[in-house]
Amino acid sequence: MSLDFYFSILPLLVSIFWFIAFAKHYRELDAAKRVLTIFFGVCSVLELCHALLYNVFEDHVLPVPLESLWFACTLSVYPIYYLYICRLTADSVSPRKTALILAPGILIALAFLLWPSAIIDTVRLVVNIVQVACVVVLGSRRLRAFDHRLAESYAETEDKDMRPTRNLLIVILLIAINSIVLNILGRESVITSQWLILFALDPIAVQLFLLGYIGYRRSFRVEQFLADNPEETLPDTPAENKELGAKIEQLMVTEAFYLQQNITLTDVARKVGSCRTYISSYINNELGCTFSDYVNRMRIAHAQELILRHDRSNGESKFSVIALEVGFTNEQSFYRNFRKFTGMTPNAWLEKQRHENHLS
């Protein structure tokens, strides 16, 4: 078999691999991963149509029923991925809204099945472009908003935030642009060129693999977020900012509650005897930061004291030990926050302190 054949079935193999990987654990999956399972099921059908187009039909034209199926899948994958983002960010989507999101692809596919024409194919391409733009813009907005909610709820967000998924949206956009350009060039131009087949299908295979890998590895469930942040009833008479601030400072600074691992806004609210909304509002408006930054800034300041203390006593500064002492659960979180608040790594910061102390 030629190299073209392997290039043409690579996206299909990747789609089937991830569909099986998710489907065999379907009952144990959370709502987001169940949507991702459906996504890879649709991708498998879509890439099967591609494989048949490139390798089975000599004139490289799909029969109208298969072409209609290809239309439906092409115009469904991006909306389904957007539904996955909605599930991932604790945004419930009603059945009616889901139907509206998926309707364009189904209607255009039915229209092509009944009245196959180049005009409908052009409509399909235009709708596809609009879908990609909406998924990238609206999806990125939802992911950023959820990251902010995470930073307002947890001290450490490394294993929870949406940066990998946000970065994937850029990949999706670039590959979608690639697909649109190839659509404009036409199937015949792509199919008759080995390099264009490689350019068309290999990036799609890489994208599908990354989508599956990041989705599969994600362990933080939105159900956990909802459990950690239950709906609360606001008291009729909110505490004065001065009084609330004093309670927060007593807990976090005097009692050094920030040294506890895995603390959440709910933990602080319970200790202070107030509600999360008021505490979050106080930290945002009066202290000018998120809950995560508030806690981790104190942790890094404490870590700096420990590093200098170890250095003055001629002891080796074991950053992994210090990270745990000041409340971080792992070195990765410690290093990221240290760089965030100081602009440098712990080693570079220590060398700078030694140099300044030597000069003084």
Question: What are the residue ranges of the model-derived segments?
Answer:
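Juxtamembrane/interfacial segments around transmembrane helices
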Residues: 59-68, 89-93, 120-131, 151-163, ...
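N-terminal low-complexity or simple alpha-helical regulatory segments
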Residues: 1-115, 120-126
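Alpha-helical transmembrane segments of multi-pass integral membrane proteins
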Residues: 26-48, 70-74, 124-186, 191-207, 323
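Membrane-proximal linker segments that couple transmembrane helices to downstream signaling/catalytic modules
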Residues: 213-332, 337-340, 347-360
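Juxtamembrane transmembrane-helix termini
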Residues: 21-31, 53-60, 84-93, 138-151, ...
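Hydrophobic faces of stable alpha-helices that mediate helix-helix packing
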Residues: 10-14, 45, 79, 140, ...
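Hydrophobic cores of alpha-helical transmembrane segments in multi-pass inner/ER membrane proteins
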Residues: 11-17, 74-83, 130-141, 204-213
